[in-house]
């Protein structure tokens, strides 16, 4: 029953569906969700971080075991054999809880080995800036939609005001400005909205200047059709980010694919739900 579909040509209007989610600790009773997703027949599925919980960045072989035990599940095989899968990481599959990698591409010394294991296990079109500038950011297109998948861990340094690091930030700004797609989807492993996380401790609100730099670019360059995706909090939310000098931005967050642990709903959200397990 395995099959694949060719994506609509870049720039061509087409009907298709894309799923996304995060928060996927290996949890045998909940692994059936991959079969459920496959049954919905999305054209692609975006894994937005915490795709596994390795939390042991210096143990490469153990990381591989964590990947392999998921990949050997019949339910996951059904999804990955029939659906284009794209992935970025968040703290638990990059390093440990709330980790920041820092601006040095090669320090701490576990960063590059973790990146190499990640590359072994996900079929992304490319991985950041390659050997000289490792990371998991990349972009791809389906029809008239451009997807920009960002890496908010490898170069994160809140003390220096950055989530992306200078190279990735330049890449994102140039890609957004050059895009002629009707819709531009920017995906992040952590939340964009200021009220969505624990006071900005582990979200874009922890680097408000860099966040504003990206949003101001959208306003000033009149970049239409931007949609924000995120994960991390164990619930599903929809937020509206008001932009007085441009159009309001909408953020869609979901991150409880297989996890048992749940975060409380948010009154500030347009929609917030945390019962059971889910994807969007």
Where would I find each of the regions flagged by the language model?
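Metal-dependent phosphoester/phosphodiester hydrolase catalytic core
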Residues: 1-280
């Amino acid at each position: 029953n395995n099959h694949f579909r060719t994506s609509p040509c870049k720039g061509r209007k087409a009907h298709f569906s894309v799923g996304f989610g995060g928060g996927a600790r290996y949890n045998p009773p909940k692994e059936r969700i991959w079969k459920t997703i496959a049954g919905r027949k999305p054209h692609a599925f975006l894994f937005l971080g915490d795709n596994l919980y390795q939390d042991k960045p210096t143990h490469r072989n153990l990381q591989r075991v964590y990947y392999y035990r998921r990949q050997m599940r019949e339910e996951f095989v059904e999804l990955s054999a029939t659906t284009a899968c794209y992935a970025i990481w968040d703290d638990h599959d990059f390093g440990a809880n709330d980790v920041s990698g820092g601006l040095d591409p090669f320090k701490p010394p576990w960063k590059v080995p973790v990146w190499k294991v990640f590359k072994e296990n996900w079929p992304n079109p490319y991985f950041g800036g390659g050997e000289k500038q490792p990371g998991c950011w990349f972009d791809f297109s389906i029809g008239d939609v451009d997807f920009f998948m960002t890496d908010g861990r490898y170069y994160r340094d809140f003390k220096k005001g950055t989530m992306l690091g200078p190279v990735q930030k330049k890449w994102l700004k140039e890609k957004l400005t050059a895009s002629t797609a009707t819709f531009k989807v920017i995906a992040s492993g952590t939340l964009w909205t200021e009220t969505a996380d624990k006071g900005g401790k582990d979200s874009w609100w922890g680097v408000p200047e860099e966040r504003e730099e990206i949003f101001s670019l959208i306003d000033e360059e009149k970049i239409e059709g931007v949609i924000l995706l995120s994960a991390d909090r164990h619930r599903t939310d929809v937020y509206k980010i008001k932009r007085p000098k441009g159009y309001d931005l909408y953020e869609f967050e979901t991150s409880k694919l297989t996890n048992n642990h749940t975060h409380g709903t948010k009154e500030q959200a347009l929609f917030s739900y945390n019962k059971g397990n889910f994807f969007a």
